Amino acid sequence: MTGEAVSGQDVSNPGKSSWRVTVLGGGAWGTALALAMLRAGHKVRLFARDPQTVAAIGQGQNPRYLPGIAIAPGIEATSDIAAALSGADCVLAVTPAQSLRATLAVAKDNMPDGIPLVLCAKGIERDTGALLSAIVEEILPRNPVAALSGPSFATDVARGLPTAVVVAARDEALAADLAARFSAQNLRCYSSDDLIGVEIGGALKNVFAIAAGAVTGAGLGASAQAAMVTRGFVELRRIGAAFGARPETLMGLSGLGDLLLTCSSAQSRNFAYGLTLGQGKALAGLPLAEGVPTAAIAARIAVERGIDAPIIAAVAAILDGAITISQAVTALMTRPLKTETND
């Protein structure tokens, strides 16, 4: 086995007992978070549907999703959902946003009552427009819901590089407890009781990451990139306010922080998708980009709620094939002039 060794031991949290943490999802982010939980001193099980992924993790690697990173022993991987959830103290849901409902439906009968379920995916459900926390509350009403979000690439977390995220729950005490239990030497977890704000920031930044990638791919320049990200954040705040998100949450790690990271690196699937789009290359075969379904949903929400969100609308129209990038730029640049802060 080759690759960069990743230790399963780091630092446990003083005064916090070890938990049995179950991770639902064997992709790059699920595997990275499993390693992070291991470093925080917890016993970790990982559920993946793909038997090959389960076998690979058992052999200390996940070449399909985290190539080049050797995973130290300690993560118990399984494709048996009942075994994965048995005796769990906490569950991290790391399946794609559009698959969450189906995953929870499968997990429902084996989910221990009362344990927290932490959302680690970012998005809005395509068919219903529901935030992911609403799906959890519908399917698992006896399990408190939380969300982990912030500027974090899977490879960085898997390698144990310094990273800061936020853990949010409506119950402030639960959020603080989860943040303390998840934190380790190079993973700093802040807490928040603004669950909706954290979810909105994480979902919408994916749309602007596609736009950022398209701007770069089309060669529109650094000035256009900066303008798009800045005005995109204005739209994020507008939609966040309509959902009741607090402004300070959107200015934090899960909003502005994640937006800056995702809009500046091809490590982001959404940026990479937009980059390919801007270059005029074929999109077939690219990894899942959550911003694609989210763009259409966010554009619809903006229209329904009377929110001015021209960048989101442009991204949705480009992805739908209704307009070209050039046409979108012209439309955005010729909008009626206004005061910058007139929201």
From Swiss-Prot:
<keyword id="KW-0560">Oxidoreductase</keyword>
<comment type="pathway">
    <text>Membrane lipid metabolism; glycerophospholipid metabolism.</text>
</comment>
<feature type="binding site">
    <location>
        <position position="269"/>
    </location>
    <ligand>
        <name>NADPH</name>
    </ligand>
</feature>
<keyword id="KW-1208">Phospholipid metabolism</keyword>
<feature type="binding site">
    <location>
        <position position="290"/>
    </location>
    <ligand>
        <name>NADPH</name>
    </ligand>
</feature>
<dbReference type="InterPro" id="IPR006168">
    <property type="entry name" value="G3P_DH_NAD-dep"/>
</dbReference>
<feature type="binding site">
    <location>
        <position position="29"/>
    </location>
    <ligand>
        <name>NADPH</name>
    </ligand>
</feature>
<feature type="binding site">
    <location>
        <position position="270"/>
    </location>
    <ligand>
        <name>sn-glycerol 3-phosphate</name>
    </ligand>
</feature>
<dbReference type="GO" id="GO:0006650">
    <property type="term" value="P:glycerophospholipid metabolic process"/>
</dbReference>
<feature type="binding site">
    <location>
        <position position="288"/>
    </location>
    <ligand>
        <name>NADPH</name>
    </ligand>
</feature>
<comment type="similarity">
    <text>Belongs to the NAD-dependent glycerol-3-phosphate dehydrogenase family.</text>
</comment>
<dbReference type="Pfam" id="PF01210">
    <property type="entry name" value="NAD_Gly3P_dh_N"/>
</dbReference>
<feature type="active site" description="Proton acceptor">
    <location>
        <position position="205"/>
    </location>
</feature>
<keyword id="KW-0444">Lipid biosynthesis</keyword>
<keyword id="KW-0443">Lipid metabolism</keyword>
<feature type="binding site">
    <location>
        <position position="205"/>
    </location>
    <ligand>
        <name>sn-glycerol 3-phosphate</name>
    </ligand>
</feature>
<keyword id="KW-0520">NAD</keyword>
<dbReference type="GO" id="GO:0046168">
    <property type="term" value="P:glycerol-3-phosphate catabolic process"/>
</dbReference>
<keyword id="KW-0594">Phospholipid biosynthesis</keyword>
<feature type="binding site">
    <location>
        <position position="268"/>
    </location>
    <ligand>
        <name>sn-glycerol 3-phosphate</name>
    </ligand>
</feature>
<feature type="binding site">
    <location>
        <position position="269"/>
    </location>
    <ligand>
        <name>sn-glycerol 3-phosphate</name>
    </ligand>
</feature>
<dbReference type="InterPro" id="IPR006109">
    <property type="entry name" value="G3P_DH_NAD-dep_C"/>
</dbReference>
<feature type="binding site">
    <location>
        <position position="150"/>
    </location>
    <ligand>
        <name>sn-glycerol 3-phosphate</name>
    </ligand>
</feature>
<feature type="binding site">
    <location>
        <position position="49"/>
    </location>
    <ligand>
        <name>NADPH</name>
    </ligand>
</feature>
<dbReference type="GO" id="GO:0005975">
    <property type="term" value="P:carbohydrate metabolic process"/>
</dbReference>
<keyword id="KW-0521">NADP</keyword>
<feature type="binding site">
    <location>
        <position position="122"/>
    </location>
    <ligand>
        <name>sn-glycerol 3-phosphate</name>
    </ligand>
</feature>
<dbReference type="Pfam" id="PF07479">
    <property type="entry name" value="NAD_Gly3P_dh_C"/>
</dbReference>
<keyword id="KW-0547">Nucleotide-binding</keyword>
<dbReference type="InterPro" id="IPR013328">
    <property type="entry name" value="6PGD_dom2"/>
</dbReference>
<dbReference type="GO" id="GO:0005829">
    <property type="term" value="C:cytosol"/>
</dbReference>
<feature type="binding site">
    <location>
        <position position="152"/>
    </location>
    <ligand>
        <name>sn-glycerol 3-phosphate</name>
    </ligand>
</feature>
<dbReference type="GO" id="GO:0008654">
    <property type="term" value="P:phospholipid biosynthetic process"/>
</dbReference>
<feature type="binding site">
    <location>
        <position position="258"/>
    </location>
    <ligand>
        <name>sn-glycerol 3-phosphate</name>
    </ligand>
</feature>
<dbReference type="InterPro" id="IPR011128">
    <property type="entry name" value="G3P_DH_NAD-dep_N"/>
</dbReference>
<dbReference type="InterPro" id="IPR036291">
    <property type="entry name" value="NAD(P)-bd_dom_sf"/>
</dbReference>
<dbReference type="GO" id="GO:0051287">
    <property type="term" value="F:NAD binding"/>
</dbReference>
<comment type="function">
    <text>Catalyzes the reduction of the glycolytic intermediate dihydroxyacetone phosphate (DHAP) to sn-glycerol 3-phosphate (G3P), the key precursor for phospholipid synthesis.</text>
</comment>
<feature type="binding site">
    <location>
        <position position="154"/>
    </location>
    <ligand>
        <name>NADPH</name>
    </ligand>
</feature>
<dbReference type="GO" id="GO:0047952">
    <property type="term" value="F:glycerol-3-phosphate dehydrogenase [NAD(P)+] activity"/>
</dbReference>
<dbReference type="GO" id="GO:0046167">
    <property type="term" value="P:glycerol-3-phosphate biosynthetic process"/>
</dbReference>
<dbReference type="InterPro" id="IPR008927">
    <property type="entry name" value="6-PGluconate_DH-like_C_sf"/>
</dbReference>
